[in-house]
């Protein structure tokens, strides 16, 4: 650290004057306190007393002694969670029968997280203020679970299962990778291999390395502080994590404190950061990106305390200097680098084996491994009386402040937004115009809800010009009236980064729009978020953040000016495979049907919506009443010609509705009975997979009314791949012999809308060919000879372009 620190002589003199400092500086168990850390603790103690956070220096040093002991006990418990079936609280060696037959755990990373999380807890205790935490390497959750158990920071279900001394600890050990299941197949234990909703204070799974790096700066609101523990492996993997200084603004962001656990190893090999040169290169890279790198001893809980405290002070000073005109954005963002070795504190530290199972064998069967476990665990053991005294200091510090379990980011529930007036139209226009006006008016009506727009590219091209004009790109140096330092639009040619800004903004209003084909790059981070939200719901603590739409536009059927890379329906198909009560997959056909959906999307809690919609002008298919009914029911009858053996035509997608209407016109001319239904929300008509999806289905009787059993011959024309749609929609496509499904067949190229439809056998003429097959009549009963030849691939496709 660059500040002036006391010399060794001064520290020795201070130790003579303050016995508690002398006791602490000796270290405990695996923890040794480097001179630089001792000096930082000296300064920290004086600052805390001067600020009124602590009554005297001795109180600070006693709590730091306590955190050494709590952290050592945390290391001890983590290695027991991996290997042991039960603990010996008297510290006696474990026998063969005390070990698991099949040990499992991400032991090395969890051991590295123990001093980190212990330091976070200690800073909260010392300052009387609860910060939030985030862990990008969610597989290290054993550290958090162990320390939460020791300090009593538990949700009720974990307290019931694991509190109460030795018996509770033994249950924790046995549940950890115990694979127990409830009768319905769900995990039985309130525990997991990654951060989950049972983890006190947990806000993200951390299953994909790198996503926390993209999200942490967008999470806290002003007045809040978030400590983000990050992975050195993710720094190699995730582009965009080094852009945070671009986006952070004191005016609308809370304090974000990133700390990388630089243990230098992936699962199988050393990372670049595992070398001195690699660390130095990384520090230089961070500096060039606008960070203020702060390397420190990642093996010492006290070093985490002092570094986090110093990071807060530095950022506070820089915000003050910005207010005085001394600095401009981007402010140098403090970035802690905790230098350590993988698996510090136990056998095998620094080896590849440290990642998972550091011992050479299974201690339940191998005597050498058993001896090594007992030898190294003994070095971590803290006598119960000594540990209890240390924990008492943590407990006492919680008086008058929020438990870490209940930190603001883990308890998000912004007020319900005021909805703007809905302005329906009766002219042909872009469906995106509905979103454009609605979101501008929504954000204006709710100034207390921080807006974020995720924009990979071409917001104006995607017909969100009003949003762009009102909210502006967030930049450092504006070069047009569409850019501003305080802009709310996060623009980067990186889909994961921009959607992460919105997924992280759980206290505000969000919108993401992208080319449909490129939305696929968002899938992993979106899926991780909705899975976490679903799990919160399942355990009875549903997420409170406001829903918002992911808009897939410039989509497959209207992106013919580009090549087939831009023609991909995978995103909506994949999200349709997720639980329908967590992400609605919607296909508004026109302006009004899009507009009618938006209030329910933004009033939802803990749910997303995927809107697959055109950006080009489309006819007005539905008036206000029809659009609102469609939003309620998920599907609607568009038109009908009664008669015997009526065909049931099902359109899913705006361009598909246009083609179906052309086909219906020809059926009417042929005096053929039919019903045309527009299917806007396919997930409402799927076979539910659990009781939550039952609730998300269409209302009682809607499916039977729209898709009556008497209409056995059915043709679906879908935006998606037909095989995917048919699989999800088997309840309304029950008999494969009497149902035909048409859609995207992975054909494309530089083609216009008609060319895309013809190439994929998804035009109006292909619909009529399917109708003829189902009715067992020749195609020429519904098509001219030339049209039939074109459908068969033996004629001129251009003949199908004209009006039917």
Walk through the language-model features, giving the residues of each.
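Cofactor-binding active-site loop characterized by glycine-rich and histidine/acidic residues
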Residues: 63, 67-93, 101-251, 465-467, ...
């Amino acid at each position: 650290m660059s500040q002036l620190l006391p010399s060794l002589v001064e520290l020795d003199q201070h130790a003579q004057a303050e016995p508690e400092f002398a006791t602490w500086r000796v270290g405990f168990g695996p923890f040794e306190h480097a001179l630089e850390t001792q000096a930082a603790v000296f300064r920290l103690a004086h600052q805390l007393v001067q600020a009124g956070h602590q009554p005297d220096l001795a109180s600070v040093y006693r709590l730091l002694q306590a955190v050494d002991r709590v952290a050592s006990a945390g290391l001890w418990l983590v290695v027991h969670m991996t290997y042991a079936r039960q603990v010996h609280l008297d510290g006696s060696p474990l026998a063969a029968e005390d070990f698991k037959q099949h040990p499992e755990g991400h032991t090395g990373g969890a051991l590295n997280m123990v001093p980190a999380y212990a330091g976070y807890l200690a800073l909260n205790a010392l300052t009387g203020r609860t910060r939030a935490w985030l862990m990008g390497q969610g597989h290290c959750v054993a550290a958090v679970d162990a320390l939460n158990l020791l300090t009593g920071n538990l949700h009720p279900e974990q307290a019931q299962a694991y509190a109460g001394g030795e018996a509770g600890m033994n249950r924790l050990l046995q549940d950890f990778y115990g694979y127990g299941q409830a009768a319905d197949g769900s995990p039985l234990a309130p525990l997991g291999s990654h951060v989950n909703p049972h983890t006190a204070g947990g806000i993200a799974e951390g299953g994909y390395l790198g996503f926390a790096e993209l999200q942490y700066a967008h999470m806290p609101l002003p007045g809040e502080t978030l400590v983000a523990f990050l992975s050195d492996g993710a720094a190699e993997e995730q582009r965009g994590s080094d852009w945070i200084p671009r986006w952070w603004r004191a005016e609308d962001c809370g304090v974000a404190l990133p700390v990388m656990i630089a243990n230098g190893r992936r699962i199988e090999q050393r990372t670049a950061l595992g070398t001195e040169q690699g660390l130095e290169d990384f520090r230089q890279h961070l500096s060039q990106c606008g960070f203020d790198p702060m390397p420190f001893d990642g093996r010492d809980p006290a070093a985490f305390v002092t570094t986090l405290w110093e990071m807060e002070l530095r950022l506070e000073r820089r915000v003050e200097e910005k207010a005085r005109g001394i600095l401009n954005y981007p402010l140098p963002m403090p970035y802690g680098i905790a230098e350590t070795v993988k698996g510090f504190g136990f056998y095998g530290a620094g080896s590849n084996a440290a990642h998972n199972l550091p011992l050479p064998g299974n201690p339940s069967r191998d005597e050498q491994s058993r001896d090594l476990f007992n030898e190294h665990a003994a070095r971590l053991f803290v006598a119960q009386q000594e540990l209890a005294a240390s924990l008492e200091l943590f407990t006492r510090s919680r008086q008058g402040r929020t438990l870490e379990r209940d930190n603001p980011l883990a308890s998000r529930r912004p007020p319900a937004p005021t909805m703007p007036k809905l302005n329906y139209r009766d002219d042909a226009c872009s469906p995106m115009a509905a979103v454009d006006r609605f979101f501008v008016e929504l954000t204006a009506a709710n100034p207390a809800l921080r807006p974020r727009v995720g924009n990979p590219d071409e917001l104006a091209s995607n017909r969100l010009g009003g949003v762009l004009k009102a909210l502006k790109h967030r930049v450092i140096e504006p070069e047009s009236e569409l850019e501003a330092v305080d802009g709310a639009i996060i623009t980067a040619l990186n889909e994961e980064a921009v959607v992460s800004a919105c997924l992280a903004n759980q206290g505000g209003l969000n919108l993401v729009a992208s080319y449909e084909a490129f939305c696929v790059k968002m899938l992993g981070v979106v899926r991780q978020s909705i899975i976490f939200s679903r799990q919160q719901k399942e355990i009875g603590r549903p997420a409170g953040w406001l829903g918002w739409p992911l808009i897939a536009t410039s989509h497959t059927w209207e992106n013919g000016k580009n090549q087939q890379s831009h023609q991909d329906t995978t995103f909506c198909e994949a999200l349709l495979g997720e639980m329908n009560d967590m992400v609605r997959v919607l296909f508004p056909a026109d302006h009004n049907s899009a507009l009618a959906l938006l209030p329910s999307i933004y009033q939802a809690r803990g749910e997303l919506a995927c809107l697959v919609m055109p950006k080009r002008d489309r006819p007005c298919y539905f008036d206000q009443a029809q659009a609102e009914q469609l939003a309620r029911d998920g599907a609607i009858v568009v038109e009908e010609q009664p008669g015997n053996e009526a065909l049931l035509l099902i359109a899913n997608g705006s361009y598909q509705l246009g083609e179906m209407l052309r086909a219906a016109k020809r059926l009417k001319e042929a005096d053929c009975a039919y019903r045309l239904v527009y299917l806007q929300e396919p997930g409402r008509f799927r076979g539910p997979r659990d009781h939550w999806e039952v609730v998300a289905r269409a209302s009682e009787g809607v499916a039977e009314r729209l898709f009556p059993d008497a209409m056995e011959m059915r043709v679906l024309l879908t935006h998606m791949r037909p095989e995917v749609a048919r699989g999800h929609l088997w309840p309304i496509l029950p008999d494969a012999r009497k149902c035909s499904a048409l859609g995207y067949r992975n054909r494309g190229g530089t083609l216009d809308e008609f060319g895309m439809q013809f190439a994929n056998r998804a035009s109006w003429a292909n619909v009529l060919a399917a109708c003829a097959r189902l009715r067992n009549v020749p195609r020429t009963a519904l098509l001219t000879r030339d049209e039939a030849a074109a459908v068969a691939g033996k004629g001129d496709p251009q003949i199908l372009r004209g009006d039917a």
